[in-house]
Amino acid sequence: MLGIGAFKQRIPCPGEALPGREQALPLHNTHLINGHPLRGEFTGLAQVQFGLGCFWGAERKFWKVPGVYTTAAGYAGGQTPNATYSEVCSGQTGHTEAVLVVFDEQAVSFEHLLRTFWESHDPTQGMQQGNDVGTQYRSAIYCTTQAQYAAALASRDAYQQQLTAAGYGAITTEIGFPAPTFYYAEDDHQQYLAKHPNGYCGLGGTGVSCPIGLDA
């Protein structure tokens, strides 16, 4: 039997992943900052999932962006349904910590969100982000439309040129379409840094400017 450490740098195969559960984790369905629902159909609004390390700091990056309707912390990209935080930390779910971003395309462009994403972390680090090591910290963009997917790929290529010029390696960000199921994290993780202002935030960008979304 493989130990937990075996999955810190490798995503488990479906047969290796924890089974999870059918029932979603309990969730207080109101955003602590803006009062909007965390879960819903969000008719007339766009959605995207971003993974950029620990979701506590990542979610705060996006709830501060004007035009973002709501945000939520969760797990995506793996095999285990309705995983718990401890299960995700084991590396045996395949999930990355992700932020669901629901936004009004008339108020903020997808390119602006992409720029926020790229500049808020180091997308060249593979299965870690700073001192946070494991598959749950991998960089990811999970798109809900073909147009988002094309824009995400184009932004990656544009940012790679800037990173290369600054001496960084290859971008390891996972970019996918269609977006996988987003499993909401436990209630305490939602808007965590608003509940715990002195809480941990390990996010750190490269300092390299992303050449998209400048006029958004």
UniProtKB/Swiss-Prot annotation:
Catalytic activity from the UniProt record: L-methionyl-[protein] + [thioredoxin]-disulfide + H2O = L-methionyl-(S)-S-oxide-[protein] + [thioredoxin]-dithiol; [thioredoxin]-disulfide + L-methionine + H2O = L-methionine (S)-S-oxide + [thioredoxin]-dithiol
Residue positions of the active site: 54
Pfam families: PMSR
Any single GO BP term: protein modification process
Its EC number(s): 1.8.4.11
One Gene Ontology term of the molecular function aspect: peptide-methionine (S)-S-oxide reductase activity
Recorded superkingdom: Bacteria
CC per GO annotation: cytoplasm
Enzyme class: oxidoreductase
Keywords: Oxidoreductase
Biological role: Has an important function as a repair enzyme for proteins that have been inactivated by oxidation. Catalyzes the reversible oxidation-reduction of methionine sulfoxide in proteins to methionine.
UniProt record similarity statement: Belongs to the MsrA Met sulfoxide reductase family.
Name under which the protein is recorded: Peptide methionine sulfoxide reductase MsrA
Organism: Xanthomonas oryzae pv. oryzae (strain MAFF 311018)
Gene that encodes the chain: msrA
